[in-house]
Amino acid sequence: MTPDQPDSDRTRIQPPSGANDRTVAFDSTQAYHAPPPAALAAPAPVASHVDSGEGLPIGTRLGEFELTQLVGVGGFGVVYLSTDHSLQRRVALKEYMPSSLAQRSGTMQVSVKSERYRETFEAGLKSFINEARLLASFDHASLVKVYRFWEANGTAYMVMPFYEGKNLRDTLRSLPQAPDEQWLRTLLLPLTEALQVIHAEQCFHRDIAPDNVMMLAGTQRPLLLDFGAARRVIGDMTQALTVILKPGYAPVEQYAEIPGMRQGAWTDVYALAAVVHYAITGRTPPPS
C-alpha cells in the first residue's frame, strides 16, 4: 500500500497562548535533581575530540554503559546502542542534546551555544528528565520501559531496552493486502490498554501515528514510541519549532486555542482512530 502522504510529514504551527507542555501531565519545572550514581559521576576517559554536531565516539563509557553504535541523531537528542557491562545486556541510551541550542566543546560536556538559549535548554532538560521518570514508573508491554536516568556532563541520559522491529507504517506497506479484523484487534488491544495506563496518570501522548508505533520483531506486539516531551517544551518556548503536528492524525484542538476545546485522553483516541483508518485504507485521513 502506498499512502497519499508520508507519515513523517509534520505541520509546524504556533502554540496556543500560554501553552504548556502537557505531553506528560506534570509541572515541567519540578524536575528530578538527585545526583547521578557514583559510577556515572566520573565517566571513563573518552577520545580527546568530540565533534560538536555529532554523537559521542563509539567506545565512550558512561559508568557501566559502553556506547557501541550510533542509532540515530535528531534535533533534540541522540540515541546509542550500548552495552550494560553490569547486567551483560544490550540497551538503548538516549542523550538529551538539542542541536539548535547546545554544543560540545571537544569533550563530553554539553553547553548552551548562547546565554539567550539557557532558559529554553534547561526547560527542555527538566522535561526530558520528568518524562524519563514517568516512563520508568509505567509497566506495560506496549509502553517503552526506562531502566534508569541521570544528569551528568551538563545534560541528561535515559537507558531503555533496545527494541527491534519495524514501525507500523512500514509493516502495513509490507502486507500483501489490507489487514483483516483479527489483525486490527491484535494491534488495537495492547495500544488501548497502554493508553489506559498513561491516561490514568493524566499523561497524554499527543503524537500517535503509524511511524510512532513499532511492531516488535518476533512477537509483532505494538510498542508506543516517542512521547517527545522535551521537543514540545522547547517548541512552546521558542515559538520557532513550535508544536509539531502530523496532519490527519492530530485532532482540531491541537491546531489552535479554541474556546471550549482542550486536549486530553480524547486527543489520543482520535489519533489512534486515525491510525486505524490508515491501516484499513492505506491513506492518511484528511486533516481535522
Stretch-by-stretch model annotation:
Residues 103-137:
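AlphaC helix of the eukaryotic protein kinase fold
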Residues 153-167, 171:
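Conserved short submotifs of the Hanks-type protein kinase catalytic core
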